[in-house]
Regions:
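Residues in the recognition helix of alpha-helical DNA-binding motifs
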Residues: 15, 58, 132, 162
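A short, conserved structural fragment
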Residues: 56-59, 63-73, 133-150
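Short, amphipathic alpha-helical interaction segments positioned at domain boundaries
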Residues: 74-77, 82-112, 157-186, 190
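Extended, charged alpha-helical interaction scaffolds
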Residues: 85, 91-133, 142-145, 150-151
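Helical coiled-coil/dimerization "stalks"
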Residues: 116-119, 148-156, 160-163, 173, ...
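Amphipathic alpha-helical oligomerization/assembly segments
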Residues: 180-215
């Protein structure tokens, strides 16, 4: 892209793509619903606390760049918003899902991307994820994804989106001399984190449903 997106714009775009894929019955999103989607605690790294003024400012900027469109649905006075990422950036549905996960959760390995994109769209294998990522990296106008250099102690390379410009690899250095028991503890920790994410996601969905209902009261 000619001008990199801001952190807020990146979060807005990711949230819109996510909601289109996971809860199409509530999409497009009102400003309130979009703000809640940006701020939800599940499937977000980092978790943010934007107000509506911050979100609408990002939306207006993205409208000028043909990344977001305002829509007025029949019978409703509430303006809603949908993304135009697939059209403007030329993304397939699978590529859009990967860009969504990258914008919402930062740099990730292929395995992490496959696991986290499952709730958006199905990838049959890790090779399918890698193929889609290679396509995003091979674009000439310009590439949307980069592969970060593998750091000492890491088995897999991580990938990051380039919508906000070049990426600074500031992940903490991995601990050296890891044992089998520490790896097992990590796996248990990841499972526990996954369960916690699911609980938070259910709570966020309930909150969004309540906000949606209030629009008709």
């Amino acid at each position: 892209m000619d001008t990199p997106l801001t952190a807020v714009e990146t979060r807005v775009l990711g949230a819109l793509i996510e909601k289109e894929m996971t809860t199409p019955e509530y999409y497009p999103l009102s400003l309130n619903a979009l703000t809640n989607a940006c701020n939800q605690s599940s499937n977000r790294e980092p978790v943010v606390d934007y107000d509506e003024a911050t979100v609408i400012s990002a939306v207006e900027s993205m409208r000028k760049r043909s990344l977001v469109r305002a829509v007025q649905q029949s019978g409703s006075r509430v303006t809603k918003y949908r993304h135009l990422a697939s059209e403007t950036l030329g993304l397939t549905e699978h590529q859009a899902a990967l860009m969504c996960v990258l914008t919402l959760r930062g740099p990730q390995t292929l395995a992490e991307l496959k696991t986290r994109a499952t709730r958006l769209i199905d990838f049959e294998s890790l090779d399918d994820v890698e193929t889609a990522m290679n396509q995003l990296m091979a674009r000439e106008s310009p590439p949307l994804v980069t592969r970060l250099e593998r750091r000492p102690g890491q088995k897999e390379a991580r990938y990051a989106h380039l919508l906000a410009g070049e990426v600074a690899d500031d992940a903490p250095e991995p601990a050296m001399g890891r044992t089998a028991s520490s790896s097992s503890a990590d796996r248990i920790g990841q499972l526990e984190q996954g369960l916690d994410d699911l609980r938070k996601e259910v709570a966020d969905l309930r909150s969004q449903l309540e906000s949606f209902r209030k629009q008709f009261e």
